[in-house]
Regions:
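Extended alpha-helical targeting/anchoring segments
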Residues: 1-492
Length: 492
Protein backbone atom coordinates (compact mmCIF):
# COMPACT_ATOMS: atom_id res chain seq x y z
CA UNK A 1 0.00 0.00 0.00
CA UNK A 2 1.44 3.36 -1.03
CA UNK A 3 1.54 6.34 1.31
CA UNK A 4 -1.17 8.29 -0.53
CA UNK A 5 -3.69 5.44 -0.23
CA UNK A 6 -2.74 5.01 3.41
CA UNK A 7 -3.38 8.71 4.08
CA UNK A 8 -6.87 8.49 2.55
CA UNK A 9 -7.81 5.43 4.60
CA UNK A 10 -6.45 6.99 7.78
CA UNK A 11 -9.11 9.71 7.70
CA UNK A 12 -11.81 7.35 9.00
CA UNK A 13 -10.04 4.17 10.18
CA UNK A 14 -8.06 3.35 13.31
CA UNK A 15 -6.65 0.12 11.86
CA UNK A 16 -5.12 -0.18 8.39
CA UNK A 17 -3.52 -3.46 7.21
CA UNK A 18 -0.34 -2.81 5.21
CA UNK A 19 0.53 -5.95 3.25
CA UNK A 20 3.19 -7.63 1.15
CA UNK A 21 2.76 -10.90 -0.76
CA UNK A 22 5.67 -13.35 -1.16
CA UNK A 23 6.07 -16.66 -2.95
CA UNK A 24 6.73 -19.20 -0.21
CA UNK A 25 5.85 -22.61 -1.60
CA UNK A 26 8.79 -24.23 0.18
CA UNK A 27 7.57 -23.43 3.70
CA UNK A 28 5.01 -25.05 5.98
CA UNK A 29 2.86 -23.23 8.55
CA UNK A 30 4.99 -24.69 11.35
CA UNK A 31 8.18 -23.45 9.65
CA UNK A 32 6.62 -20.01 9.22
CA UNK A 33 5.74 -19.94 12.89
CA UNK A 34 9.31 -20.86 13.85
CA UNK A 35 10.81 -18.18 11.62
CA UNK A 36 8.40 -15.33 12.26
CA UNK A 37 7.05 -15.86 15.76
CA UNK A 38 10.08 -17.69 17.17
CA UNK A 39 7.78 -19.25 19.80
CA UNK A 40 7.48 -15.90 21.63
CA UNK A 41 4.64 -15.18 24.08
CA UNK A 42 1.82 -13.26 22.42
CA UNK A 43 1.96 -15.36 19.24
CA UNK A 44 -0.26 -18.03 17.72
CA UNK A 45 -0.78 -20.49 14.88
CA UNK A 46 -4.28 -21.26 13.53
CA UNK A 47 -4.95 -24.02 10.99
CA UNK A 48 -7.88 -26.06 9.74
CA UNK A 49 -8.37 -29.49 8.19
CA UNK A 50 -11.82 -29.86 6.67
CA UNK A 51 -13.52 -33.02 7.95
CA UNK A 52 -10.19 -33.93 9.50
CA UNK A 53 -8.63 -34.64 6.10
CA UNK A 54 -7.92 -31.94 3.48
CA UNK A 55 -6.22 -28.73 4.61
CA UNK A 56 -8.19 -25.52 4.32
CA UNK A 57 -6.95 -22.70 2.11
CA UNK A 58 -5.44 -20.47 4.81
CA UNK A 59 -3.20 -20.86 7.85
CA UNK A 60 -2.63 -17.88 10.14
CA UNK A 61 0.57 -17.11 12.05
CA UNK A 62 0.31 -14.44 14.73
CA UNK A 63 3.73 -12.78 14.71
CA UNK A 64 3.31 -9.93 17.18
CA UNK A 65 0.65 -8.48 19.48
CA UNK A 66 0.34 -4.80 20.31
CA UNK A 67 -1.26 -5.58 23.69
CA UNK A 68 -3.05 -8.37 25.54
CA UNK A 69 -6.41 -8.12 27.28
CA UNK A 70 -6.72 -10.48 30.23
CA UNK A 71 -8.31 -10.52 33.69
CA UNK A 72 -6.76 -10.14 37.11
CA UNK A 73 -8.75 -10.45 40.36
CA UNK A 74 -11.95 -10.35 38.35
CA UNK A 75 -11.05 -7.08 36.60
CA UNK A 76 -9.96 -6.33 33.06
CA UNK A 77 -6.19 -6.01 32.85
CA UNK A 78 -4.00 -5.05 29.91
CA UNK A 79 -0.46 -6.21 29.24
CA UNK A 80 1.14 -3.58 27.04
CA UNK A 81 -0.47 -0.32 25.98
CA UNK A 82 -4.21 -0.55 25.22
CA UNK A 83 -5.89 1.68 22.63
CA UNK A 84 -7.11 5.03 23.94
CA UNK A 85 -10.80 5.00 24.84
CA UNK A 86 -11.16 1.37 25.93
CA UNK A 87 -11.69 0.29 29.56
CA UNK A 88 -8.58 -0.62 31.52
CA UNK A 89 -10.49 -2.14 34.45
CA UNK A 90 -13.99 -3.38 35.24
CA UNK A 91 -15.76 -6.22 33.42
CA UNK A 92 -13.28 -7.89 31.01
CA UNK A 93 -16.11 -8.79 28.63
CA UNK A 94 -17.12 -5.14 28.46
CA UNK A 95 -13.50 -4.23 27.75
CA UNK A 96 -13.39 -6.77 24.91
CA UNK A 97 -16.58 -5.39 23.37
CA UNK A 98 -15.33 -1.80 23.67
CA UNK A 99 -11.99 -2.67 22.03
CA UNK A 100 -13.64 -4.28 19.03
CA UNK A 101 -16.03 -1.35 18.64
CA UNK A 102 -13.27 1.26 19.00
CA UNK A 103 -11.09 -0.39 16.35
CA UNK A 104 -13.88 -1.36 13.95
CA UNK A 105 -12.59 -1.20 10.37
CA UNK A 106 -14.33 -2.35 7.16
CA UNK A 107 -12.85 -5.40 5.49
CA UNK A 108 -10.41 -4.53 2.72
CA UNK A 109 -11.19 -6.06 -0.67
CA UNK A 110 -8.90 -8.82 -1.90
CA UNK A 111 -7.51 -9.80 1.50
CA UNK A 112 -7.98 -13.10 3.39
CA UNK A 113 -10.98 -13.45 5.74
CA UNK A 114 -8.89 -12.57 8.80
CA UNK A 115 -6.30 -9.79 8.82
CA UNK A 116 -6.26 -8.77 12.47
CA UNK A 117 -8.37 -8.49 15.58
CA UNK A 118 -8.69 -9.88 19.09
CA UNK A 119 -7.48 -13.48 19.13
CA UNK A 120 -7.38 -15.95 22.02
CA UNK A 121 -9.83 -17.63 24.38
CA UNK A 122 -12.82 -17.03 26.62
CA UNK A 123 -12.83 -19.51 29.50
CA UNK A 124 -16.02 -21.35 30.41
CA UNK A 125 -16.32 -19.50 33.71
CA UNK A 126 -16.81 -16.13 32.07
CA UNK A 127 -20.42 -17.31 31.68
CA UNK A 128 -20.86 -16.22 35.31
CA UNK A 129 -20.95 -12.68 33.92
CA UNK A 130 -23.82 -13.69 31.62
CA UNK A 131 -25.88 -16.13 33.72
CA UNK A 132 -26.52 -16.74 37.42
CA UNK A 133 -25.04 -20.22 37.73
CA UNK A 134 -23.28 -20.03 41.09
CA UNK A 135 -20.15 -18.49 42.58
CA UNK A 136 -17.65 -21.12 41.43
CA UNK A 137 -15.49 -20.43 44.46
CA UNK A 138 -13.23 -23.45 43.95
CA UNK A 139 -10.57 -22.49 41.41
CA UNK A 140 -7.36 -24.51 41.65
CA UNK A 141 -5.99 -23.57 38.19
CA UNK A 142 -6.61 -19.83 38.62
CA UNK A 143 -6.53 -19.24 34.87
CA UNK A 144 -7.58 -15.78 33.63
CA UNK A 145 -11.23 -15.72 32.56
CA UNK A 146 -10.10 -14.62 29.13
CA UNK A 147 -6.89 -13.81 27.31
CA UNK A 148 -7.19 -12.00 23.98
CA UNK A 149 -4.27 -10.77 21.88
CA UNK A 150 -4.60 -7.46 20.04
CA UNK A 151 -2.84 -8.73 16.94
CA UNK A 152 -0.73 -6.23 15.05
CA UNK A 153 1.46 -8.39 12.76
CA UNK A 154 0.60 -11.71 11.16
CA UNK A 155 1.36 -13.88 8.17
CA UNK A 156 -1.29 -15.71 6.16
CA UNK A 157 -0.24 -18.78 4.20
CA UNK A 158 -2.37 -19.41 1.10
CA UNK A 159 -2.09 -23.13 0.39
CA UNK A 160 -3.80 -22.78 -2.99
CA UNK A 161 -1.32 -20.20 -4.27
CA UNK A 162 1.77 -21.30 -2.36
CA UNK A 163 2.11 -17.71 -1.18
CA UNK A 164 2.43 -15.88 2.13
CA UNK A 165 0.78 -12.54 2.80
CA UNK A 166 2.62 -10.50 5.42
CA UNK A 167 0.34 -8.07 7.28
CA UNK A 168 1.47 -5.19 9.49
CA UNK A 169 -1.57 -3.48 11.00
CA UNK A 170 -1.09 0.23 11.59
CA UNK A 171 -3.15 0.75 14.74
CA UNK A 172 -4.02 4.29 15.78
CA UNK A 173 -3.67 3.73 19.53
CA UNK A 174 -4.15 7.40 20.45
CA UNK A 175 -7.14 8.09 18.16
CA UNK A 176 -5.41 11.24 16.90
CA UNK A 177 -5.15 12.66 13.38
CA UNK A 178 -1.39 13.18 13.64
CA UNK A 179 1.45 10.76 12.93
CA UNK A 180 -0.08 9.22 9.80
CA UNK A 181 3.12 9.19 7.73
CA UNK A 182 5.11 7.82 10.67
CA UNK A 183 2.55 5.02 11.15
CA UNK A 184 2.90 4.02 7.50
CA UNK A 185 6.69 4.03 7.74
CA UNK A 186 6.56 1.91 10.89
CA UNK A 187 4.26 -0.66 9.23
CA UNK A 188 6.57 -0.89 6.21
CA UNK A 189 9.56 -1.38 8.52
CA UNK A 190 7.74 -4.25 10.25
CA UNK A 191 7.04 -5.84 6.87
CA UNK A 192 10.74 -5.53 6.05
CA UNK A 193 11.64 -7.22 9.34
CA UNK A 194 9.22 -10.09 8.73
CA UNK A 195 10.51 -10.59 5.20
CA UNK A 196 14.06 -10.71 6.53
CA UNK A 197 13.04 -13.25 9.19
CA UNK A 198 11.60 -15.46 6.46
CA UNK A 199 15.03 -15.71 4.84
CA UNK A 200 16.55 -17.14 8.02
CA UNK A 201 17.41 -20.82 8.03
CA UNK A 202 15.74 -22.44 11.04
CA UNK A 203 17.01 -25.86 12.01
CA UNK A 204 14.14 -28.33 12.01
CA UNK A 205 15.63 -31.78 11.48
CA UNK A 206 13.24 -34.71 11.05
CA UNK A 207 12.27 -36.23 14.38
CA UNK A 208 11.46 -39.89 14.88
CA UNK A 209 7.75 -40.12 15.66
CA UNK A 210 7.47 -42.76 18.39
CA UNK A 211 4.46 -45.08 18.61
CA UNK A 212 1.41 -43.41 20.11
CA UNK A 213 0.88 -44.54 23.69
CA UNK A 214 -1.47 -43.41 26.43
CA UNK A 215 0.67 -42.03 29.28
CA UNK A 216 0.08 -42.36 32.96
CA UNK A 217 -2.21 -39.59 34.10
CA UNK A 218 -4.05 -38.40 37.18
CA UNK A 219 -7.76 -37.55 37.28
CA UNK A 220 -8.94 -34.66 39.42
CA UNK A 221 -12.44 -36.09 39.69
CA UNK A 222 -12.77 -39.53 38.21
CA UNK A 223 -13.71 -43.11 38.85
CA UNK A 224 -16.11 -43.67 41.78
CA UNK A 225 -16.66 -39.97 42.56
CA UNK A 226 -17.61 -39.19 38.97
CA UNK A 227 -19.94 -42.18 38.78
CA UNK A 228 -21.72 -41.09 41.96
CA UNK A 229 -22.19 -37.67 40.39
CA UNK A 230 -23.67 -39.27 37.27
CA UNK A 231 -26.26 -41.05 39.42
CA UNK A 232 -27.02 -37.75 41.15
CA UNK A 233 -27.56 -36.06 37.78
CA UNK A 234 -29.83 -38.88 36.61
CA UNK A 235 -32.01 -38.38 39.69
CA UNK A 236 -32.23 -34.66 38.97
CA UNK A 237 -33.19 -35.37 35.36
CA UNK A 238 -35.93 -37.77 36.48
CA UNK A 239 -37.17 -35.06 38.85
CA UNK A 240 -37.54 -32.70 35.88
CA UNK A 241 -34.68 -30.31 36.67
CA UNK A 242 -32.99 -30.80 33.28
CA UNK A 243 -33.03 -32.91 30.13
CA UNK A 244 -29.27 -33.34 29.92
CA UNK A 245 -26.22 -32.30 31.95
CA UNK A 246 -22.59 -32.51 30.79
CA UNK A 247 -20.20 -33.06 33.73
CA UNK A 248 -16.48 -33.19 32.99
CA UNK A 249 -13.25 -34.59 34.37
CA UNK A 250 -9.82 -33.01 34.29
CA UNK A 251 -6.75 -35.14 33.68
CA UNK A 252 -3.12 -34.14 34.05
CA UNK A 253 0.14 -35.63 32.85
CA UNK A 254 3.78 -34.46 32.79
CA UNK A 255 4.81 -32.34 29.80
CA UNK A 256 8.50 -31.76 29.10
CA UNK A 257 7.96 -30.95 25.41
CA UNK A 258 7.56 -27.48 23.96
CA UNK A 259 4.07 -26.28 23.11
CA UNK A 260 5.07 -26.27 19.44
CA UNK A 261 6.10 -29.93 19.54
CA UNK A 262 2.82 -30.89 21.21
CA UNK A 263 1.01 -29.00 18.46
CA UNK A 264 3.08 -30.67 15.73
CA UNK A 265 2.15 -34.12 17.01
CA UNK A 266 -1.51 -33.23 17.50
CA UNK A 267 -1.91 -31.81 13.98
CA UNK A 268 -0.27 -34.94 12.56
CA UNK A 269 -2.29 -37.46 14.56
CA UNK A 270 -5.63 -35.71 15.04
CA UNK A 271 -6.26 -33.11 12.31
CA UNK A 272 -9.51 -31.20 12.89
CA UNK A 273 -11.44 -28.18 11.60
CA UNK A 274 -9.96 -26.01 14.36
CA UNK A 275 -6.29 -26.43 15.27
CA UNK A 276 -4.51 -23.87 17.39
CA UNK A 277 -1.35 -23.06 19.28
CA UNK A 278 -1.24 -20.04 21.58
CA UNK A 279 1.75 -18.85 23.58
CA UNK A 280 0.55 -16.62 26.40
CA UNK A 281 2.36 -15.05 29.33
CA UNK A 282 3.06 -17.98 31.68
CA UNK A 283 1.07 -20.71 29.92
CA UNK A 284 0.31 -22.19 26.51
CA UNK A 285 -2.81 -23.59 24.84
CA UNK A 286 -2.73 -26.32 22.20
CA UNK A 287 -5.83 -27.87 20.70
CA UNK A 288 -7.54 -29.70 17.88
CA UNK A 289 -11.27 -29.03 18.22
CA UNK A 290 -13.81 -30.61 15.87
CA UNK A 291 -16.63 -28.22 16.72
CA UNK A 292 -17.40 -24.57 16.03
CA UNK A 293 -19.10 -22.57 18.74
CA UNK A 294 -20.38 -19.92 16.35
CA UNK A 295 -19.16 -18.17 13.21
CA UNK A 296 -20.25 -14.77 11.88
CA UNK A 297 -19.34 -13.73 8.34
CA UNK A 298 -20.87 -10.85 6.37
CA UNK A 299 -23.81 -10.62 8.77
CA UNK A 300 -24.63 -14.34 8.63
CA UNK A 301 -24.34 -16.42 11.83
CA UNK A 302 -23.75 -20.17 11.84
CA UNK A 303 -23.65 -22.86 14.52
CA UNK A 304 -22.67 -26.44 13.80
CA UNK A 305 -24.00 -28.78 16.53
CA UNK A 306 -22.16 -32.07 16.92
CA UNK A 307 -23.55 -34.91 19.02
CA UNK A 308 -23.36 -38.63 18.51
CA UNK A 309 -20.06 -40.42 18.03
CA UNK A 310 -18.69 -43.67 16.66
CA UNK A 311 -15.09 -44.73 15.89
CA UNK A 312 -13.97 -44.98 12.28
CA UNK A 313 -14.11 -48.44 10.76
CA UNK A 314 -11.06 -50.40 9.64
CA UNK A 315 -12.59 -50.96 6.17
CA UNK A 316 -15.06 -48.95 4.06
CA UNK A 317 -17.72 -51.56 4.76
CA UNK A 318 -17.17 -51.44 8.53
CA UNK A 319 -17.06 -47.64 8.41
CA UNK A 320 -20.45 -47.50 6.68
CA UNK A 321 -21.92 -50.04 9.10
CA UNK A 322 -20.84 -47.89 12.04
CA UNK A 323 -22.33 -44.80 10.38
CA UNK A 324 -25.63 -46.62 9.84
CA UNK A 325 -25.62 -47.77 13.46
CA UNK A 326 -24.97 -44.21 14.64
CA UNK A 327 -27.82 -42.75 12.59
CA UNK A 328 -30.20 -45.46 13.83
CA UNK A 329 -29.42 -44.97 17.53
CA UNK A 330 -32.50 -43.30 19.10
CA UNK A 331 -30.53 -41.96 22.10
CA UNK A 332 -27.93 -40.31 19.85
CA UNK A 333 -30.63 -38.84 17.59
CA UNK A 334 -32.62 -37.47 20.54
CA UNK A 335 -29.53 -35.85 22.05
CA UNK A 336 -28.58 -34.32 18.71
CA UNK A 337 -32.09 -32.95 18.12
CA UNK A 338 -32.00 -31.28 21.53
CA UNK A 339 -28.73 -29.53 20.63
CA UNK A 340 -30.11 -28.38 17.28
CA UNK A 341 -33.05 -26.83 19.13
CA UNK A 342 -30.61 -25.14 21.52
CA UNK A 343 -28.71 -23.71 18.57
CA UNK A 344 -31.90 -22.39 17.00
CA UNK A 345 -32.94 -20.77 20.27
CA UNK A 346 -29.50 -19.18 20.81
CA UNK A 347 -29.39 -17.68 17.32
CA UNK A 348 -33.03 -16.62 17.61
CA UNK A 349 -32.05 -14.20 20.37
CA UNK A 350 -29.75 -12.17 18.09
CA UNK A 351 -30.93 -12.85 14.54
CA UNK A 352 -33.74 -11.36 12.47
CA UNK A 353 -37.13 -13.01 13.12
CA UNK A 354 -37.80 -15.80 10.66
CA UNK A 355 -34.21 -15.95 9.40
CA UNK A 356 -33.01 -18.86 11.55
CA UNK A 357 -33.11 -22.17 9.71
CA UNK A 358 -31.56 -25.63 9.76
CA UNK A 359 -29.76 -25.89 6.43
CA UNK A 360 -28.14 -29.30 6.99
CA UNK A 361 -29.84 -31.75 9.34
CA UNK A 362 -28.28 -34.88 10.82
CA UNK A 363 -25.58 -35.89 8.40
CA UNK A 364 -22.55 -38.00 9.28
CA UNK A 365 -19.24 -36.14 9.25
CA UNK A 366 -16.08 -38.22 9.30
CA UNK A 367 -12.81 -37.23 10.99
CA UNK A 368 -9.46 -38.98 11.31
CA UNK A 369 -10.46 -41.20 14.26
CA UNK A 370 -14.20 -40.74 14.78
CA UNK A 371 -17.44 -39.84 13.03
CA UNK A 372 -20.21 -37.58 14.36
CA UNK A 373 -23.80 -36.62 13.62
CA UNK A 374 -23.72 -32.96 12.60
CA UNK A 375 -26.20 -30.27 11.62
CA UNK A 376 -25.85 -26.65 10.54
CA UNK A 377 -28.08 -23.82 11.75
CA UNK A 378 -27.85 -20.33 10.25
CA UNK A 379 -29.47 -16.93 10.74
CA UNK A 380 -29.11 -13.31 9.63
CA UNK A 381 -27.70 -11.16 12.42
CA UNK A 382 -30.31 -8.58 13.46
CA UNK A 383 -29.73 -4.87 12.97
CA UNK A 384 -27.94 -3.31 15.91
CA UNK A 385 -26.40 -6.65 16.87
CA UNK A 386 -22.73 -7.58 16.46
CA UNK A 387 -20.56 -10.68 16.31
CA UNK A 388 -19.84 -10.09 20.00
CA UNK A 389 -23.58 -10.27 20.76
CA UNK A 390 -23.88 -13.49 18.77
CA UNK A 391 -20.94 -15.03 20.61
CA UNK A 392 -22.30 -14.22 24.07
CA UNK A 393 -25.80 -15.42 23.08
CA UNK A 394 -24.40 -18.83 22.12
CA UNK A 395 -21.93 -19.09 25.01
CA UNK A 396 -21.20 -21.69 26.27
CA UNK A 397 -22.07 -24.44 23.82
CA UNK A 398 -24.97 -26.68 24.75
CA UNK A 399 -22.77 -29.68 24.02
CA UNK A 400 -20.59 -28.67 26.99
CA UNK A 401 -23.35 -27.67 29.41
CA UNK A 402 -26.66 -29.41 28.75
CA UNK A 403 -30.28 -28.35 28.52
CA UNK A 404 -31.85 -26.17 29.60
CA UNK A 405 -28.53 -24.34 29.79
CA UNK A 406 -28.96 -22.24 32.96
CA UNK A 407 -30.08 -25.11 35.20
CA UNK A 408 -27.59 -27.56 33.66
CA UNK A 409 -24.76 -25.12 34.40
CA UNK A 410 -25.98 -24.65 37.98
CA UNK A 411 -25.87 -28.42 38.50
CA UNK A 412 -22.36 -28.56 37.03
CA UNK A 413 -21.27 -25.79 39.38
CA UNK A 414 -22.66 -27.71 42.37
CA UNK A 415 -21.00 -31.01 41.48
CA UNK A 416 -17.66 -30.37 39.76
CA UNK A 417 -14.78 -29.93 42.24
CA UNK A 418 -13.27 -26.82 40.60
CA UNK A 419 -13.88 -24.16 38.01
CA UNK A 420 -13.41 -25.40 34.45
CA UNK A 421 -11.07 -22.66 33.29
CA UNK A 422 -10.47 -22.92 29.54
CA UNK A 423 -12.41 -26.16 29.00
CA UNK A 424 -15.87 -25.67 27.53
CA UNK A 425 -15.19 -22.04 26.65
CA UNK A 426 -14.08 -21.01 23.19
CA UNK A 427 -10.95 -20.30 21.17
CA UNK A 428 -10.78 -18.08 18.11
CA UNK A 429 -11.07 -14.48 16.99
CA UNK A 430 -13.28 -11.42 16.78
CA UNK A 431 -11.90 -9.33 13.94
CA UNK A 432 -11.88 -5.59 13.31
CA UNK A 433 -14.34 -5.94 10.40
CA UNK A 434 -17.17 -7.36 12.51
CA UNK A 435 -16.73 -11.07 11.76
CA UNK A 436 -15.79 -13.87 14.14
CA UNK A 437 -14.88 -17.54 14.14
CA UNK A 438 -14.70 -19.50 17.39
CA UNK A 439 -14.29 -23.15 18.28
CA UNK A 440 -15.45 -24.91 21.42
CA UNK A 441 -12.43 -25.45 23.66
CA UNK A 442 -12.37 -29.24 23.66
CA UNK A 443 -9.62 -31.72 22.69
CA UNK A 444 -7.35 -29.05 24.14
CA UNK A 445 -4.35 -28.99 26.48
CA UNK A 446 -3.40 -26.24 28.88
CA UNK A 447 0.39 -26.39 29.30
CA UNK A 448 1.86 -24.79 32.40
CA UNK A 449 4.71 -25.50 34.77
CA UNK A 450 5.70 -28.83 33.21
CA UNK A 451 2.15 -30.23 33.33
CA UNK A 452 -0.50 -30.72 30.66
CA UNK A 453 -4.12 -30.35 31.77
CA UNK A 454 -6.75 -31.97 29.55
CA UNK A 455 -10.48 -31.98 30.30
CA UNK A 456 -13.37 -33.92 28.77
CA UNK A 457 -17.05 -34.41 29.51
CA UNK A 458 -19.99 -36.70 28.84
CA UNK A 459 -23.64 -35.90 28.18
CA UNK A 460 -25.79 -37.46 30.89
CA UNK A 461 -29.45 -38.32 30.28
CA UNK A 462 -31.96 -40.34 32.29
CA UNK A 463 -30.73 -43.76 31.16
CA UNK A 464 -26.96 -43.11 31.10
CA UNK A 465 -24.57 -45.80 32.37
CA UNK A 466 -22.14 -44.22 34.89
CA UNK A 467 -19.30 -46.60 34.00
CA UNK A 468 -19.69 -45.95 30.27
CA UNK A 469 -19.86 -42.18 30.79
CA UNK A 470 -16.70 -42.26 32.92
CA UNK A 471 -14.94 -44.14 30.14
CA UNK A 472 -16.27 -41.72 27.51
CA UNK A 473 -14.50 -38.84 29.25
CA UNK A 474 -11.25 -40.79 29.21
CA UNK A 475 -11.70 -41.76 25.56
CA UNK A 476 -12.25 -38.12 24.56
CA UNK A 477 -9.14 -36.98 26.43
CA UNK A 478 -6.96 -39.80 25.08
CA UNK A 479 -5.93 -38.20 21.75
CA UNK A 480 -4.52 -35.10 23.43
CA UNK A 481 -2.89 -37.04 26.28
CA UNK A 482 -1.25 -39.30 23.70
CA UNK A 483 -0.02 -36.28 21.73
CA UNK A 484 1.62 -34.82 24.85
CA UNK A 485 3.30 -38.14 25.65
CA UNK A 486 4.50 -38.55 22.05
CA UNK A 487 5.87 -35.00 21.98
CA UNK A 488 7.78 -35.71 25.19
CA UNK A 489 9.55 -38.55 23.35
CA UNK A 490 10.14 -36.95 19.93
CA UNK A 491 13.49 -37.96 18.49
CA UNK A 492 14.16 -40.53 21.22
Amino acid sequence: MDLETFRKLATDRRVIPVTRKLLADGDTPVALYRKLAAERPGTFLLESAENGRSWSRYSFVGVRSAATLTARDGQAHWLGVPPVGVPTDGDPLAALRATIEALHTPHQEGLPPFTGGMVGYLGYDIVRRLEKIGPGERDDLRLPELTMLLTSDLAVMDHWEGSVLLIANAINHNDLDTGVDEAHADAVARLDAMEEDLTRAVAQPPAVLPPSELPEYAALWGGPDFRVAVEDIKERIRAGEAFQVVPSQRFETPCTASALDVYRVLRATNPSPYMYLFRFDGFDVVGSSPEALVKVEDGQAMVHPIAGTRPRGATPQEDQALADELMADPKERAEHLMLVDLGRNDLGRVCEPGSVEVVDFMSVERYSHVMHIVSTVTGKVAGGRTAFDVLTACFPAGTLSGAPKPRAMQIIDELEPSRRGLYGGCVGYLDFAGDSDTAIAIRTALLRGGTAYVQAGAGIVADSDPVAEDQECRNKAAAVLRAVHTANRLGM
